[in-house]
């Protein structure tokens, strides 16, 4: 098995997390997984959705989008079509669920955090890059809210990261790029905490069904890659 990028089966793409990437948001990063590049911002607003009012806790929600020419051919903006596509809705819900798992919302006060993940260049793994980058932006945003005195304590329970794994040419591989993803027999997206817990596992067989042993091999690869991602997040936050 030869990967198009020349990487080993258990090798992540080169990853970079650049903090404070935009001026106005409470937290922002540019996250790069190889040629996939996503701007993640976290905006804080006072108040919560109606279903949470008066309960003394906060909320976090997420939106996801792709620039029209983030892909090989231009895609029409969803705004010009008048509605979001099913893929977009699925991904932004995944991002929101994943980031909420990192927080104790009761310590957020009655504040809402808006996660915005905008893909400026896509080469596979945009949802996993978004979650990994948005976690760092979230931690920066919480630091800003702490300075403002808006928090009841430290809402952060754990770090969160995500990575893709799959079966490519019969072999489990880590962190698929677009060429691999489009030809993979199986594609799996894994979201985990730095304590080793799973938040979400999304898996689909594109060719032949995958066997339990292959699923276990992919999950082991994901766990291995996740440790590297948490180290990269911590290194970015230490800068």
From Swiss-Prot:
GO biological process, one term: rRNA catabolic process
Membrane-spanning ranges: none
Pfam families listed in its UniProt record: RNase_PH (PF01138), RNase_PH_C (PF03725)
Consequence of changing residue 77 to S: Still forms hexamers, no exonuclease activity, does not bind pre-tRNA
Catalytic activity: tRNA(n+1) + phosphate = tRNA(n) + a ribonucleoside 5'-diphosphate
Alphabetically ordered keywords of this record: Nucleotidyltransferase, RNA-binding, rRNA processing, Transferase, tRNA processing, tRNA-binding
Binding site for phosphate: 87, 125-127
Molecular function per GO: 3'-5'-RNA exonuclease activity; RNA binding; tRNA binding; tRNA nucleotidyltransferase activity
Entry's EC annotation: 2.7.7.56
InterPro entries: ExoRNase_PH_dom1, ExoRNase_PH_dom2, ExoRNase_PH_dom2_sf, PNPase/RNase_PH_dom_sf, Ribosomal_Su5_D2-typ_SF, RNase_PH, RNase_PH_bac-type, RNase_PH_CS
Keyword Lipid biosynthesis: no
Assembly notes: Homohexameric ring arranged as a trimer of dimers; dimeric protein does not seem to be catalytically active.
Family: Belongs to the RNase PH family.
Purpose: Phosphorolytic 3'-5' exoribonuclease that plays an important role in tRNA 3'-end maturation. Removes nucleotide residues following the 3'-CCA terminus of tRNAs; can also add nucleotides to the ends of RNA molecules by using nucleoside diphosphates as substrates, but this may not be physiologically important. Probably plays a role in initiation of 16S rRNA degradation (leading to ribosome degradation) during starvation.
NCBIfam families the record matches: RNasePH (TIGR01966)
Protein name per its UniProtKB record: Ribonuclease PH
Organism: Pseudomonas aeruginosa (strain ATCC 15692 / DSM 22644 / CIP 104116 / JCM 14847 / LMG 12228 / 1C / PRS 101 / PAO1)
Origin organism lineage: Bacteria, Pseudomonadati, Pseudomonadota, Gammaproteobacteria, Pseudomonadales
Gene name tied to this protein: rph
